């Protein structure tokens, strides 16, 4: 039997033709793996990672049905219902009315947009990397609404609130997470 993470990798690559989507999936996967370890879910690292990898599985081919097409695609691949629920609720309030319940789902909701913002900020740096980025630099980019305008700050703020974290904590931890997976 193939592992969910292997199926996840194959689906992600098959259904994401654009490098950007593959890269985003891998960044969110690495970030989710980091948070699983950090928050005491060490036995679920692969599960959290696979959810991160698959969270936008329907976005590229069916952007109008984002979070609505995913359950069908994932069920066909034999992905379990917990994972499907997590994928669907990452779009809560945007393209889904399924609310994040589990801590893992709240982390995905909170860091999905934020990984995009950090990635965009990294590309502006001479190093093209987030490894030498400091929290104050990220906070400046976060406050500048024109920078990476497609990254919804309200979702990031709402995600921090869902988790019961200060915004700075979410920004800092997600930045640290991305430093661990940037080369993936």
Could you tell me what each predicted segment is?
Residues 18-29, 64, 101, 132, ...:
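Electropositive phosphate-/nucleotide-binding environments in soluble metabolic enzymes
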Residues 16-17, 32, 36-39, 77, ...:
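Structural signal for hydrophobic packing residues in well-ordered secondary-structure cores
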Residues 1-8, 12:
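Single conserved hydrophobic/aromatic residue that forms the stacking wall/gate
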Residues 9-10, 29, 33, 71, ...:
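An amphipathic alpha-helix signature
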Residues 41-147, 157:
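Divalent metal-dependent catalytic cores for phosphoryl transfer on phosphate-bearing substrates
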Residues 130-133, 137-184:
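A structured, mid-to-C-terminal "fold-capping" secondary-structure block
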Residues 18-46, 60:
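Alpha-helical phosphate/pyrophosphate-handling elements in metalloenzyme active cores
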């Amino acid at each position: 039997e193939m592992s969910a993470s292997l199926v996840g990798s194959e689906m992600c690559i098959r259904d994401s033709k654009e490098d950007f989507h593959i890269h985003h999936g891998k960044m969110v996967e690495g970030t989710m793996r980091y948070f699983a370890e950090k928050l005491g879910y060490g036995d679920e690292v692969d599960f959290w990672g696979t959810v991160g990898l698959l969270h936008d599985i329907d976005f590229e081919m069916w952007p109008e049905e984002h979070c609505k097409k995913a359950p069908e695609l994932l069920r066909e691949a034999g992905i379990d219902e917990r994972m499907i629920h997590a994928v669907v609720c990452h779009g809560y309030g945007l393209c889904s009315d399924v609310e994040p319940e589990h801590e893992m789902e709240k982390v995905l909701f909170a860091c999905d947009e934020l990984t995009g913002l950090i990635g965009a900020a990294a590309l502006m740096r001479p190093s093209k990397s987030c490894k030498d980025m400091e929290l104050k630099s990220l906070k400046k980019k976060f406050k500048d609404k024109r920078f990476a305008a497609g990254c919804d700050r309200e979702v990031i703020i709402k995600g921090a609130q869902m988790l019961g974290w200060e915004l700075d904590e979410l920004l800092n931890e997600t930045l640290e997470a991305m430093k661990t997976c940037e080369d993936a």
